[in-house]
Amino acid sequence: MNYFPWLTIIVVFPIFAGSLIFFLPHKGNRVIRWYTICICILELLLTTYAFCYHFQSDDPLIQLVEDYKWINFFDFHWRLGIDGLSIGPILLTGFITTLATLAAWPVTRDSRLFHFLMLAMYSGQIGSFSSRDLLLFFIMWELELIPVYLLLCMWGGKKRLYSATKFILYTAGGSVFLLMGVLGLALYGSNEPTLNFETSVNQSYPVVLEIIFYIGFFIAFAVKSPIIPLHTWLPDTHGEAHYSTCMLLAGILLKMGAYGLIRINMELLPHAHSIFSPWLMIIGTIQIIYAALTSLGQRNLKKRIAYSSVSHMGFIIIGISSLTDTGLNGALLQIISHGFIGAALFFLAGTTYDRIRLVYLDEMGGIAIPMPKMFTMFSSFSMASLALPGMSGFVAELIVFFGIITGQKYLLIPKILITFVMAIGMILTPIYSLSMSRQMFYGYKLFNAPKDSFFDSGPRELFLSISIFLPVIGIGIYPDFVLSLAVDKVEVILSNFFYR
């Protein structure tokens, strides 16, 4: 056992260092920007070092465990630990947050508060992924919502207050169900309330009670993922938020919902999950088609990308509900893959808006010639989004496909129907993705406009795009880099469905 508190340092460091921003000397925004980026890089290096030297990927048990008594009255512990399931999202969080702080370079209004909120969000996200205590998980889940609300309220577009209110109503409503589920699990069947994940995993519940818990947790995670029909906050939020906030929302926030579904609904409540998995499969297939068709009808560029995110989350839901190790591994790979691709598309959409000051696709056109680098990067990530072979999205969706086909739970006819509908969804993806590129970059609309603001991507934007593109290509060529982290843990989770 490793006694050095690596995870506590990794969780607490961003918010602690971020609070020192307010004590920095007043010497312009440059000092604040560099300070925040240095904190993010230091945190990412610290996380990578701790995981490289103290984490054994072939061990499915919880590692780097820390357990400190916090509140005696309620048996509340500061309990942290990681396994193959959480290491990928934690590293993704570090990577995307570091790049999002770099993307936030143009933000000048209330710069101190903006960067502090980004670092507070960073702590909340890593805390959620590494919590091994149900109440601590809930606290971290909530800690991460407040910065998003403030980032939306203060640095959004014209309808930012409407979007922020809608976001907080949806997520706070989901959090009520999460809290009820946490307290229900803690107080069931024992005089002493137990909030420990390990104890809850080995606990068995009456079927009706397990179903009630499952529905409560599912609503909370369905809002965050988002799963239809609880997805309507997402397009509005993405449409109004600053693009650096959009990177964090698309890259990390949505993945927390999928992570919660696997960590709590699958691992803690396997009987209920096996009952609900056929319905989840149906919801996932409907979501892929519905969101792809809705995306095609969107005029707003950021809303179109937001609906594409909802469509891609459908593959994750199908992988989770397939109850096969292939399908679940595919879902975990899609979580990482879409984290990179979604963040990159929102970044490029935001930087394009900074130049041409147009939001609607039917007003754009012809910017490929004055902005060739932007055109190349946007086209590359559009290809990654539509799952081009050689990129991460293709491998993830293919593995989810195989997961359904090889699954023992479903009969042949439902399998054929689901794969057929998924295939239609995969055909619709290039239609909305390529039409988006065509409307933005081809034609003659903006070609004859004044070229004053039509400068191409600078070194910062180019560096940021390439930094995200390299992992997308890397995972597409060698997916085992991500898959090997969680293979053993996935087998342990799925063993509950056959032996319990």
Swiss-Prot record:
Pfam families: Proton_antipo_M
GO biological process, one term: electron transport coupled proton transport
Subcellular location(s) of the protein: Plastid, Chloroplast thylakoid membrane
Xref: InterPro entries: NADH_Q_OxRdtase_chain4, NADH_Q_OxRdtase_chainM/4, NADH_UbQ_OxRdtase, ND/Mrp_TM
Broad enzyme group: translocase
The keyword Coiled coil is annotated on this UniProt entry: no
Transmembrane regions listed in the UniProt entry: 4-24, 35-55, 87-107, 113-130, 134-154, 167-187, 208-228, 242-262, 274-294, 305-325, 330-350, 386-406, 411-431, 462-482
E.C. numbers: 7.1.1.-
Gene Ontology cellular component list: chloroplast thylakoid membrane
Stated family: Belongs to the complex I subunit 4 family.
Protein name per UniProt: NAD(P)H-quinone oxidoreductase chain 4, chloroplastic
Taxonomic source organism: Nicotiana sylvestris (Wood tobacco)
Phylogenetic lineage: Eukaryota, Viridiplantae, Streptophyta, Embryophyta, Tracheophyta
Gene from which the chain derives: ndhD
